[in-house]
């Protein structure tokens, strides 16, 4: 038998031409996956022993290790028998703060309370609104008349242009730029502009002449 054939047989496959397609059992031998120089360590069969090995290899804080040891009932009995105050060995468990510790403000408590009364809900909403007034609040809830004109009908004069399409009708209308007629009027006083234009939203006040003012005072 040639050295090449010996090598092929040692590798587990019979590749020689004289095999004459023998049966699979003869020609193919399964090679064990263990390498030649591997150490044959016996696996730990005892589960408890394996568990102890695993726990000892873990990097843990003393209290976590104590908790891990006392988690098992048999371990707990064993440990308490060994040392009566084993629970005092580690640092006490850290108390996690919960949301219940935080003091809730009365307004938020009122908002969260679900008493079911619609009047309570109205009261809650109104208290919330008056508590935190913002420009957005004014624009949304300020003047009902202005709101009505601002949204307007989709067939309003502003929306119908030379190029009207139903696509535009669904779109949000831009705020109109100040027209020429507004520019002709007197400029807004700084006091009024400071109020976000809310003063000028109502009925336009006529400027009283000095003589008329004096008449009112008398």
Swiss-Prot record:
Superkingdom field: Eukaryota
Stretches with biased composition (Basic and acidic residues): 183-195
Region Disordered, annotated ranges: 1-39, 63-116, 170-205
Protein name as it appears in the record: Uncharacterized protein B0304.2
Compositionally biased region (Polar residues): 1-21, 68-102
């Amino acid at each position: 038998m040639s050295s090449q054939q010996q090598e092929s047989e040692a590798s587990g496959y019979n590749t020689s031409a004289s095999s004459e397609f023998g049966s699979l059992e003869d020609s193919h031998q399964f090679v064990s996956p263990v390498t030649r120089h591997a150490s044959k360590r016996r696996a730990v069969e005892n589960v408890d022993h394996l568990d102890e090995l695993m726990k000892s290899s873990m990097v843990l804080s003393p209290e976590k290790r104590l908790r891990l040891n006392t988690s098992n009932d048999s371990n707990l009995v064993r440990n308490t028998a060994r040392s009566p105050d084993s629970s005092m060995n580690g640092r006490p468990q850290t108390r996690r703060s919960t949301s219940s510790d935080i003091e809730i403000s009365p307004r938020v408590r009122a908002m969260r309370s679900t008493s079911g009364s619609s009047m309570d809900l109205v009261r809650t909403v109104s208290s919330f609104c008056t508590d935190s007034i913002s420009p957005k609040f004014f624009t949304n809830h300020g003047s009902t008349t202005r709101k009505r004109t601002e949204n307007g009908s989709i067939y309003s004069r502003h929306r119908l242009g030379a190029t009207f399409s139903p696509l535009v009708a669904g779109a949000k209308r831009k705020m109109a730029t100040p027209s020429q007629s507004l520019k002709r009027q007197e400029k807004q006083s700084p006091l009024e502009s400071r109020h976000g234009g809310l003063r000028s939203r109502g009925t336009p006040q006529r400027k009283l002449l000095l003589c008329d003012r004096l008449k009112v005072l008398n």
